[in-house]
Amino acid sequence: MTGHVFTIAGGKGGVGKTTTAVNVGVAMQDAGYDVVIVDADLGMANLAAMLEIDYDTSLHEVLAERAAISDTLTEGPGGVTVVPGEQSLEAFADADPAKLRKVIKTLSNAYDIVFIDTGAGLSHEATVPLGLADSVLLVTTPDSVAIGDAGKTAQLAKRVDGEVIGTILTRAEEQSEIDEVETGVDHPLLAVIPEDSEATTNEPLVVNFPDTAAAEAYHHLATALERVLKGESVDTIVEEETEWFPSGDETEEEDEDDDSGGVLGLFS
């Protein structure tokens, strides 16, 4: 039985694709799955830099037929395996995105779960991972441009036979922002990740700051994806989320004790 391939995509840069791949990957490793995270952002790879890990061989070298995928496997935080990318323009020029198919097939035969972290835009190298996925996860912020780009990515995924199973909203603080995403992206909302000042600077949050609302949200997402792997429908999972933010008297009482904002009430 081959592993499940999740492609993390979104169109716009800076929405939290890499952060999501890292945190949900570590969370699922912690849940007992053997996980590998692939930095397929061929133009601006940043996974290794974000995690501050050293590596000997990059994915770019494999795609340029100068190394084997086994040479790239690097130990990451929380026990996950990382396939790092390279940042030089020369490496980008030599890498052939079409060879990513063989790489992902090899990894899916060796791991329970493969997370593909993709680049921004709708270029060829950003499109290839969409067609290789068993499931595509869209990541967006409440920003209207990001929402629009996520929608375009979903359309592109459909053209290359990629199945988008849901959307992950980052940096949301109000119900109105959730409504905008659900209207702008025609796919179920699987998770809401609150803004966290430690994100992108002290990753992974689920290891370094496990008690934060953001870390809890990533674990919540990992649980949802685990249910997907076990055959539950996304609609069933999403229907159980009656509200992403607390409301009414409970919220007012929390606000009296903590004036730091509604996102701290996520998933309570």
Predicted feature descriptions by range:
Residues 43, 55, 65, 96-100, ...:
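Helical mechanochemical/support elements of P-loop NTPase systems and associated helical scaffolds
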Residues 109, 113-201:
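Conserved catalytic-core segment of NTP-binding enzymes
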Residues 10, 17, 40, 135, ...:
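Short, conserved catalytic or interaction motifs in soluble domains
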